[in-house]
A protein has these predicted regions:
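Bacterial N-terminal signal peptides that target proteins for export
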Residues: 1-8
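Bacterial N-terminal signal peptides
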Residues: 8-18
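Mid-to-C-terminal functional-domain signal that highlights helix-capping/loop sites
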Residues: 22-297
């Protein structure tokens, strides 16, 4: 019997798919730029270990944890969440060991990372507003539970996280450590979906929803990136050649098993509803479901 492929479903901008083909080998001598040095003063990162060129790391503006992760998340029930979430508001949804939780993008857009424990499993929920990628990871790795924060750096316009235990840098889109003591290590991805709040309610009537009581003063009903995902825009701080097969800001569903990587335009999924395809030699089906609007608008 063929072992099923491990699939990752993430709604992302098309340009970010170039990451999966990036050379992950050390580039040899590649000194930190003056800008990068200034952005990382006081860090205890082991800069002698890296699998990328340092010139690929760019400051997104805010300092480390200037976009604050949520470390002590509070949750409410579906009925309480109805007071401020519309039925089609997008949430990152997952279920582990019978524990179902939803993380509204209205909150994640402002924080990007939530360190949580779901079904007794330490996890981190991540969202990159620049590439619209929503990915969950198991954060207990080789006997250590890691806490993640925002580094303030970007690579290929994607969130670069750091762990507080070793201060290594991790690429959000792949879950791979790219700089520091953990370079080359890979976090385990956890199946999570980007769905509408009403869909979460229907599937998990007793599920929990991340509360707006985050400990930070943010206007969660306001989108801090209005118009960013206009199809005619260019990705922020993306300096590599853009794949011309689709507009750079086109939304796609990506599926990966670690070796093979497919991208499906959302417009195509909305048109056909179901697409039968293969990931490598593994047959697969991709479904489109209505009921969730896009966060940006």
């Amino acid at each position: 019997m063929t072992k099923p492929a491990v699939l990752l479903f993430a709604l992302v901008m098309f340009f970010i798919t170039n990451l999966v083909s990036a050379n992950s080998q050390s580039k040899g001598e590649d000194k930190l730029s003056d800008l990068l040095r200034r952005a990382t003063i006081g860090w205890n990162t082991d800069w002698s270990k890296h699998s990328i060129e340092y010139r690929e790391l760019l400051s997104g503006g805010p300092p480390r944890d200037g976009i604050p992760p949520i470390d002590q998340p509070k949750f409410i029930d579906n009925q309480q969440a109805e007071q401020w979430l519309a039925p089609n508001d997008p949430v990152i949804a997952l279920e582990l060991n019978g524990d179902a939780r939803a993380y509204p993008l209205q909150i994640l857009t402002w924080h990007e990372i939530v360190n949580d424990t779901v079904g007794e499993i330490p996890i981190t929920i991540t969202f990159c507003p620049l590439c619209n990628s929503a990915i969950a990871f198991e954060r207990h790795y080789q006997g250590t539970t890691y806490d993640f924060g925002t580094s303030g750096l970007l690579r290929h316009s994607d969130l670069v996280m750091y762990d507080r235990q070793t201060e290594s840098l991790w690429q959000q889109f792949t879950g791979e450590a790219i700089v520091g003591a953990m370079t080359g290590e890979q976090l385990k991805m956890i199946p999570a979906g980007l769905i509408g709040f009403e869909q979460f309610q229907s599937a998990y009537p007793t599920g929990k929803v991340l509360s707006k009581e985050t400990g930070y003063s943010r206007d969660y009903v306001r989108n801090p990136y209005p118009g960013y995902d206009d199809i005619h825009n260019n990705p922020f701080l993306f300096r590599d050649p853009v794949d011309k097969r689709l507009p750079a800001m086109a939304r796609v569903v990506t599926i990966s098993d670690g070796e093979y990587h497919n991208a499906y335009p959302v417009t195509l999924l909305e048109k056909f509803g179901v697409i039968h395809h293969q990931l490598g030699n593994q047959p697969m089906v991709v479904f489109s479901s209505s009921g969730s609007q896009q966060r940006f608008g």
